[in-house]
Amino acid sequence: MKLTFILPLLALTLVARAEEPKPLRAGIIGLDTSHVLAFTQSLNKGPKNPADADKVAGVKVVAAYPQGSRDIEGSTKRVPEYTEKVKALGVEIADSVEDLVQRVDVIFLESNDGRIHLEQLRPVLAAGKPVFIDKPIAGSLADAIRILDAAKQAKVPLFCSSSLRFGKTTQAVRNGSIGKVKSAETFSPASLEPTHVDLYWYGVHGCESLFTVMGTGCQSVKRGTTTDGKIEVTGQWAGGRTGIFREENGQDRKGYGGKAIGETGEAPVGGYDGYDVLLFEIIKMFRTGVVPVSAEETLELYAFMEAADESKRRGGAEVTLQEVLAKARAEIAARP
């Protein structure tokens, strides 16, 4: 009787163990953004919604390399505080990126300063570790191309995204809730950092929402100013579709949001649903090797924002994405 009872119990135990996800040791590069606290809290203590615990099961942040930006004061001043906070969550501090990659299986490249991403990424790619790069992917379009090309050559899963991409209403439209999108308008904060392309620093959030619902196919960009003095960027997509990003104004465009018009109706887009929605996609990529955002779409998004800067330099003239991409590739050819 005892054996009859024990054998089924043993079988159930073995099945349960087989279904448990493989443990993954995560490492963080750059402790100069609040995102590291949000991600580490969700992975090491549990997501905000306990029902989502299975989406992060088996993944823990075990080590971090603190150095992020070297000269952006708003970033550098955060490092000591955030270092202590992640240590309190059980994270060990590594002496270098090279040291970090030896301790972990997967990487969050979180340095707020996009200019140092390529440098910090190289040891990660050399070690073959899957990596998520927080926005912006780089400080320039040329470096964005270098990063995407290097990951492809190394055959390492890599993607970059704002959490805004995975907001519920934005994803619904992306997945066809209003049919093919004919036009969309999004807004978000767009504070500037002189060392970066204007929209790379913060406007990328609203621009990412725009590309999530519009998809690829943007051909040209014109930059202007709203009636209340804020940034306005209008993109023309193939097939006569139009996408517009505007800087939020704290009034009728407050925070994050927007609207998409499709073949079968319209819907709100661009809302902020927290960091966990992005984190869950990162974990899926770490486990499957399948990226949720293609390199092509990411490159077009950053070309759109670079073209907006070029349009600004030309007094609001129309600038094609093909032009800024060619310029960036020429820069790479001159300085590989």
Give the positions of each predicted feature.
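Hydrophobic residues in well-ordered beta-strands that form the structural core
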Residues: D95, I133, L158-C160
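Hydrophobic h-region of N-terminal signal peptides that target proteins for export
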Residues: L9-A18
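Short helix/strand-capping hinge loops at secondary-structure junctions
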Residues: G128-P130, K135-P136
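Sec-dependent signal peptide recognition
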Residues: M1-P8
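Rossmann-like dinucleotide-binding domain that binds NAD(P)(H)
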Residues: E185-R253, E296-A303
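C-terminal helix-rich "cap/oligomerization" subdomain common to oxidoreductases
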Residues: E20, I107-F108, T288-P336
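A contiguous active-site-proximal alpha/beta segment in oxidoreductase catalytic domains
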Residues: I137-H196
